[in-house]
Every structure is written in structure tokens, then in C-alpha cells.
Amino acid sequence: MLRPLPAFATTTSLVVVVLFLAASAAVQAGDEADAGGGGVVGVDGTRFVVDGGRTIYFSGFNAYWLMLMASDPARRGKVTAAFRQAAAHGLNLARTWAFSDGGDRPLQSSPGVYDEAMFQGLDFVIAEARRHGVYLLLCLTNNFHDFGGKRQYIRWARDAGHRDLAADDDFFNSTVVKGYYKNHVKTVLTRVNTFTGVAYKDDPTIFGWELMNEPRCDADPTGAMVQAWVEEMAPYVKSIDGEHLVTAGLEGFYGDGAHESKDLNPWGIYYGTNFIATHRAAGVDFATIHLYPDVWLWGSGAGEQLAFFKNWTQSHVEDTERYLGKPLLVTEYGKFLWEGVANRTQRNYFLGMVLDSIYDSAAAGGPLVGGAFWQLLDDGMDTLRDGYEIILPEDRRAASIISSHSRQLAELNGQDVEALRRRRSRRANRKIHVDGSGRGRSSSHTPQFKILLLRFIAFFRSVSSLFSGV
């Protein structure tokens, strides 16, 4: 017959249990903190915050191709290499596609029909980002026809009998098409990762959701159509995932609304968006701009492009602070790399200017607190070169500029840069175990948990034995 332990033993056992649970939670929390640098990212005024209020700044990159590459297990090494290089250079944010609408390599081949191999590719991307301490900004569709986008949604609707839809911009006001888009949003956000077992909407690796890459609307230059669409879709995303941040995906073009600095638009043209009004919409947590002076001002001289860069950046920083009170990210920036050393020097000069503007704002407490260059590639990916690529191992000067900027932002974060680098390196060395189906699980905190459990059992037995003869 078992006898009850004395009160002291019971209390001691309870304390042990509490300590054990606390230690287990600490291990889990440590893993979540490493997932991207500090758990789920939130917003406090013009700051991004983690860990209950610590400010975080972002040194990032674009790599739209991650899911596509990872959908083929034989090519997943390129994804791992990209994250490894990013982490080694202090990058902590990656912007990539969570869509591929129709076409030859679709994620969504038709409305509501998904390719599991492609989805597992996205699963792998998220798992690898987590392993290397990189946050992800996931974009949900495209304004342009690359990888489907608006045009593919319209084609699906027309194929279903909705022949009244003729233009790509009908995407923004068609009830049918908006239903297709919402279904995609729900499918992606509620997806359970086959490598981590965590639903996307619950994964702290994900920094946020971008409604569309570079929304534009020629059919309505005033911006009203895009505005209404964002006002509907941002709250819809929030209704499924109330934890992660949401942004519209704008390039920063001004419209015809109040406080819009429309004279700053390239060539003074309207693009059907309103930088200020759209970023004021409910459910939109932060503002974005893109920066391509050599493309937007094609044929202009270096001096004119430099003046545009300064005015564009400064205007958006001031307007974000004055009218939005939200953080601002440059989610794309780049300069086309022509052949020759001279142009590479110009590209690196542009890179330094953008990064300096980000740092100057962040260091002064301004709203511009991060950016992501277009685009990161690995060696041997020549077919994806677009003239904007940065391959860190082969461009030492660009790599040095990026690393220096990342270090500066990490120091603003109040982080020990070398300790952060070592922690990310240790985490990256943890393997993802893949079973015969191609699915996997990260080793994560399992070893630490087992050690804690064994220690708990041993200690509990030793405490119990002290009173076994009472």
C-alpha cells in the first residue's frame, strides 16, 4: 500500500515539477527566439518589436525563387546555401513568394487545387529560415503575370463562365476572383508545415504577410479600387491570423488623395495606388516602398537619379512619421548591373546609400527601420540572373557593405553581434530529419527536453526515497 508523503516531500515535489516545467518552457522559448531573432514580431508606433518590447531592425534580401527551388528535393541545397550565406552576413529577413498561380510549376494549379510537392517546398523554406534565424515576409500573389498573379485569377474566372471579366484589373473588384484569393489566403495561413508540425499562422519564423507584390491599377488611377481591395483583404487575413503583421505590398507611389506627394512619382504618373491612404487601412501594420531609380527614370542621368533617390526616401520617411505613425521598410531596392567594373562600383555606391539612409533613420528613432535588396542568388544559378542579383561569395565589396550594415543594425538592436552569430551557427547545424515520404521534422529542442526529463525523473526519485521509510 502506498503511503502519502509528508507535506514537506509533497511541497518539494511540487517545486520540482514547477522548475521542470519552467525549464522546458525556457528551452521552447529559446527555440522560438532563435526562429527569427526573438519570437513573433509586433509593432509599437514606428518600431518593430519582439520579446515583449525590444526593438528590432531588419537587414534583408529578396529571393522569390525559394519555394520553386525547394519543391525539388535535389535542389534544396541551394535554399540551405542561401540562408547559410544570409546568416553569415547578418541578414535577418527574407522576402519570398508564397504563390505560384497556374503555369508549369504551380503551387495552385486551379482555384483551390494545390500541388503537394510545391507546398512541401514552401514548408522546407520556412523550416530552413527558422533553422538559420531568418524571418520571412511571405507574399500572397502578384500584380504582374509572372507566376500567375492577377491575370491568372481572371483567366480562372473566365474559364468558369464569368465572361464579363476582361481586364487584369477586374481582379480588384470581382466577387468571384476575390473569393478565389481569399481561399488561397486561408489555405496558406492554415497550412501545417510537414517539417515542423507548426501551422503557418502560428509560426514565429514568419514576419508577416504581403497581400500582393507591387499592386497597381491602370483602370483606376485614383487608387480607389486598390484601396477598397486592401480594406477588405487586410482584415480578412487578420481574421485568420491575428498574430502576424500584414502589409499591402506597395511600391510607394502617391495618388490623388489628401497629403499625397504625387509630384514625386516618377515622371509624375499615377499608378492607381495611394501611399498614405492605403497604409492607413485597418489591418495594415507597416508601410513599404520600393526603390529603382535607374528603371523608374530610364534614360535620365546619374545626378537626376540621385536627386530622385534622396527626395523619394526623405518624403516617405517624413510622411510615414507624420501621417501613418507606423514602421517603414524598403522591401525592394536595386540597381541594374551592366557589364564592367565601373558599373559594379556604381551599384555598390547605390547599395551603400540605401543602407546608410536606413541606418540614419533607425539610429535617430525614425520610421525607416529596415530593407531588403533585390535579389540574393547562390553560385550556379545563372538562369535566374536578372541583372540585379547579388551573389555574396563572388562580390566581396557588396558582401562587405551588407555585412557592415547588418552589424550596425544588430548593435542598434542591443545584441552581442558575435554571440548572435554563434547562436545562429549552432542552430543551423541542427539537422532536419526526413522520412521516406520526403517529409521531415527538425531535431529542434528534443535533445535538451530529453535531458531535462531524465534529470527530473532522477531527482524526483531521489527526493521520494528520502521519505520512503517515514
Question: Where do the language-model regions lie?
Answer:
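Basic polycationic patches enriched in arginine
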Residues: 3, 426-430, 439-441, 455, ...
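N-terminal signal peptide
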Residues: 18-36
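Classical eukaryotic N-terminal signal peptides for Sec-dependent ER targeting/secretion
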Residues: 1-16
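Active-site mouth of glycoside hydrolases
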Residues: 32-327, 333-358, 362-393, 397-401, ...
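Compositionally biased, low-complexity segments
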Residues: 9, 20, 439, 458-464
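Long, low-complexity, intrinsically disordered segments
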Residues: 449-470
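C-terminal GPI-anchoring signal of eukaryotic secretory precursors
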Residues: 437-448
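A recurrent domain-boundary module in secreted/ectodomain proteins
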Residues: 394-436, 459
